[in-house]
């Protein structure tokens, strides 16, 4: 079982959303994609943003997301910033 759970991660990610606004993530799939993308960044040499007892990039990515060290942005927002 994943700790924190998908539901816990979704609550953390959506915690800054104002009432009436669209949630940042609506599904577990979004969490999986975001953590996988961050894990690939770590594998490619990005520095972890949190201290972790784990050496696995995916575990580090999950922990970063849970501690709000990384934010999930939509592809539309990402393209606007480029």
Swiss-Prot record:
Enzyme class: transferase
Keyword DNA repair (UniProt): no
Catalytic activity: RNA(n) + a ribonucleoside 5'-triphosphate = RNA(n+1) + diphosphate
Residue ranges crossing the lipid bilayer per the database entry: none
Record-listed E.C. numbers: 2.7.7.6
GO biological process: DNA-templated transcription
One family name in Pfam for this protein: RNA_pol_Rpb6
A GO molecular function held by the record: DNA-directed RNA polymerase activity
A GO CC term attached to the entry: DNA-directed RNA polymerase complex
SUPFAM superfamilies for this protein: RPB6/omega subunit-like
Keywords: DNA-directed RNA polymerase, Nucleotidyltransferase, Transcription, Transferase
Record carries keyword Nucleotidyltransferase: yes
Domain of life per record: Bacteria
Quaternary structure (record): The RNAP catalytic core consists of 2 alpha, 1 beta, 1 beta' and 1 omega subunit. When a sigma factor is associated with the core the holoenzyme is formed, which can initiate transcription.
HAMAP family linked: RNApol_bact_RpoZ
Function: Promotes RNA polymerase assembly. Latches the N- and C-terminal regions of the beta' subunit thereby facilitating its interaction with the beta and alpha subunits.
NCBIfam families reported for this sequence: rpoZ (TIGR00690)
Family per record: Belongs to the RNA polymerase subunit omega family.
Protein name per Swiss-Prot or TrEMBL: DNA-directed RNA polymerase subunit omega
Natural source organism: Lachnoclostridium phytofermentans (strain ATCC 700394 / DSM 18823 / ISDg) (Clostridium phytofermentans)
